[in-house]
């Protein structure tokens, strides 16, 4: 049986989106904090060091349906948000905010959500 081109295109599109979605959320997510603001995971496979003393990692707040790319200044005890992605309940992207040119570093407060993550990734 031959499928019309439109049906074939829709099937291929759905397969492609499924693979892309699996790659994004098929990462190595590990819980690092359970706070009043949400349950937080980090993607161990995404940890990168763009320069000496700096580490980047994706985090996911399951409660708020948000993922953020965080950069830590391991020597300075500070961080900045480089990318923020908001999802709906079905996992579709609602909004994306690119802060890659953000020059503002924030101090990591003791007992904050990011303190245990900094300890993990800045070894």
What are these model-derived regions, one by one?
Residues 1-10:
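Bacterial N-terminal signal peptides that target proteins for export
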């Amino acid at each position: 049986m031959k499928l019309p081109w439109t049906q074939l295109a829709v099937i291929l599109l759905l397969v492609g989106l499924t693979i892309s979605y699996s790659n994004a959320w098929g990462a190595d997510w590990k819980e690092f904090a359970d706070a009043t603001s949400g349950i937080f995971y980090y993607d161990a496979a995404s940890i990168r060091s763009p320069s000496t003393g700096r580490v980047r990692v994706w985090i996911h707040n399951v409660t708020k349906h948000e993922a953020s790319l965080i950069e830590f200044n391991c020597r300075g005890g500070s961080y900045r948000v480089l990318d923020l992605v908001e999802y709906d309940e079905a996992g579709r992207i609602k909004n994306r905010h690119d802060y890659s040119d953000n020059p503002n570093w924030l101090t990591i407060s003791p007992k904050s959500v990011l303190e245990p993550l900094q300890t993990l990734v800045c070894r």
